[in-house]
């Protein structure tokens, strides 16, 4: 069917939801194209899209169809342990969770649904804790209020890898019904929908408490500000900090769950606007650090008071500090395993890797997306050859202990608070700790530059851009020689004029250029947002040196994409 045929099918559907019908009636040609040119697709972190009418939107029909695909796969595999379901604070989240449970029940599959919003890491934990076959998380993470999303987890509490997602997509594509209606359940089927017991909350909180390395540290003379950005994390974080005894000031205007994110300029911890109100609180109460989680509670942002000013740390910087703290403390206590392994992604800074290697910890790289890290953890657990000690990615996601198989903002909050308190007791800040790492391992600066390209035109342009870069391999970047090039789509490495196969990764549209000065640049179209991204890991002799290089590299990129 073409776009107009799809549109008319939706418009004339007799059972179409009234709000979706009104949206369809008001669409112009451009809006029709964007809503129907493709079906909603699974990207880096599940299916994430703008709420609304159409095949390329998140609505009850696309949610039901996705869940039907999952149900078909589970029944084909004779799975009988059910599916855990949680949801965040967004518009339609409760309805999407309920509809997912009903579809599963219509296929004879049990579900365990939370009665109110919970964080993404707790959903991952719940799948494992209740020995479920799968999990569904209704969330769009840090995206704007117009979005929602649908993430599927496997029996290990890990987001589905492309191979497993492919099975669900194949099942969806074979569904005969164009519109999946709400099923009319029998009494027996209704009994398959269960509410998750409150005891799971306490079990999860108690597990998170085990990430502390120095719980005996005095909490005196240490204060922090925390905001959940109107999302899911407030109850869990408050429970943790109350148990541990930190002096916490909560940003009250942002503690209530709110799908409109009314009192935050941006709910994304990567964006400085997310900290505006929290920093006002911090200045008033003279807090040592500011912590913020994103709406679904898997990612964490940090600001540190240093020399009288609050400094925002990037995910790479925070990751480096945590790595050094965790590994040094474990080494001191004799609890760092001999076969320790750390995971990070191909667009994460080299600094963390250098620190890990100094402690004898091996490092394995994955593609972007914590699903790959979760999968690696499981592979090594099966082989019993390596012991997980840390996993992280540049986009503010960290995992300290693997009772969760996704990034965990709750674990991160607790450990970073302890880390900051530890350094304060030594008359240091986390910035001082970071500067010591630069002195030891070299100065690094990591940053990102993105082009926002929306709709069908934007998607086509992004594909043309990546193909253009792929077909015209750069031999130098802003005057610096490219000494190695990796194409994760074609799975090749070119070094010293020699082409080799790039193994150990699924195919992905990522290109990476390694420069003679130890820096690298990676480019990829985002799998969760309409953005074409450039990642920079810049190595130099000093802060002035890396800042000058960054300016030069940015100008070069601007010229490339004109």
Where are these regions (language model features)?
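An N-terminal, well-structured beta->alpha segment
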Residues: 2-100, 107, 190-222, 232
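Gly/Ser/Thr-enriched, mixed-charge loops and adjacent short helices
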Residues: 15, 31-40, 148-276, 282
């Amino acid at each position: 069917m073409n776009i107009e045929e799809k549109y008319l099918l939706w418009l004339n559907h007799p059972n179409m939801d009234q709000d979706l019908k009104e949206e369809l009636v008001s669409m112009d040609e451009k809006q029709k194209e964007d809503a129907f040119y493709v079906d909603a697709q699974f990207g880096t972190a599940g299916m994430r899209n703008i709420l609304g009418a159409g095949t390329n939107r998140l609505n009850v029909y696309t949610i039901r169809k996705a869940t039907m695909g999952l149900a078909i796969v589970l029944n084909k595999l004779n799975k009988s342990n059910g599916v855990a379901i949680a949801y965040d604070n967004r518009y339609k989240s409760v309805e999407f969770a309920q509809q997912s449970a009903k579809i599963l029940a219509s296929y004879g599959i049990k579900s365990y649904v939370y009665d109110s919003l919970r964080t993404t890491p707790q959903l991952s934990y719940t799948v494992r804790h209740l020995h479920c076959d799968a999990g569904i998380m209704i969330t769009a993470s840090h995206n704007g209020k117009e979005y929602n999303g649908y993430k599927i987890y496997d029996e290990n509490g890990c987001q589905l890898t492309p191979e497993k997602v492919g099975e669900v997509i194949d099942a969806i594509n074979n569904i005969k019904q164009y519109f999946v209606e709400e099923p009319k359940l029998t009494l027996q089927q209704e009994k398959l929908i269960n509410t998750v017991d409150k005891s799971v909350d306490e079990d999860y909180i108690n597990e998170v408490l085990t990430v502390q390395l120095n719980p005996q540290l005095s909490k005196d003379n240490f204060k922090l500000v925390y905001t959940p950005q109107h999302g899911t994390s407030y109850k869990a974080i408050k429970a943790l900090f109350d148990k541990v005894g930190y002096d916490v000031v909560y940003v009250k205007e942002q503690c209530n769950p709110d799908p409109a994110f009314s009192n935050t300029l941006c709910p994304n911890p990567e964006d400085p606007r997310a900290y505006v109100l929290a920093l006002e609180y911090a200045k008033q109460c003279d807090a040592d650090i500011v912590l913020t989680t994103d709406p679904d509670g898997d990612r964490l942002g940090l600001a540190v008071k240093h020399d009288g000013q609050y400094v925002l740390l990037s995910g790479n910087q925070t990751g480096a500090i945590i790595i050094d703290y965790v590994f040094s403390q474990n080494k001191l206590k004799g609890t760092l395993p001999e076969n320790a392994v750390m995971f990070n992604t191909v667009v994460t800074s080299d600094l963390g890797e250098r620190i890990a290697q100094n402690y004898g910890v091996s490092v394995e790289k994955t593609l972007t997306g914590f699903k790959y890290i979760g999968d690696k953890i499981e592979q090594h657990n099966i082989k019993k050859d390596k012991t997980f000690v840390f996993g992280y990615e540049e986009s503010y996601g960290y995992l300290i202990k693997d009772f969760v198989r996704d990034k965990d903002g709750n674990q991160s909050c607790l450990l970073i608070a302890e880390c900051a308190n530890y350094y304060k007791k030594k008359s240091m800040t986390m910035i001082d700790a970071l500067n010591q790492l630069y002195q030891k391992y070299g100065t690094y600066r990591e940053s990102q530059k993105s082009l926002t390209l929306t709709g069908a035109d934007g998607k086509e342009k992004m594909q043309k851009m990546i193909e253009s870069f792929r077909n015209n391999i750069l031999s130098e970047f802003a005057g610096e020689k490219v000494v190695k090039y990796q194409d994760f789509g074609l799975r090749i490495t070119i070094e010293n004029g020699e082409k080799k196969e790039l193994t150990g990764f699924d195919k992905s549209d990522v290109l990476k250029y390694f420069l003679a000065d130890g820096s690298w640049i990676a480019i990829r179209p985002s799998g969760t947002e309409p953005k074409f991204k450039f990642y920079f890991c810049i190595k130099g002799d000093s802060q002035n040196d890396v800042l000058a290089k960054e300016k030069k590299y940015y100008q070069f990129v601007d010229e490339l994409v004109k």
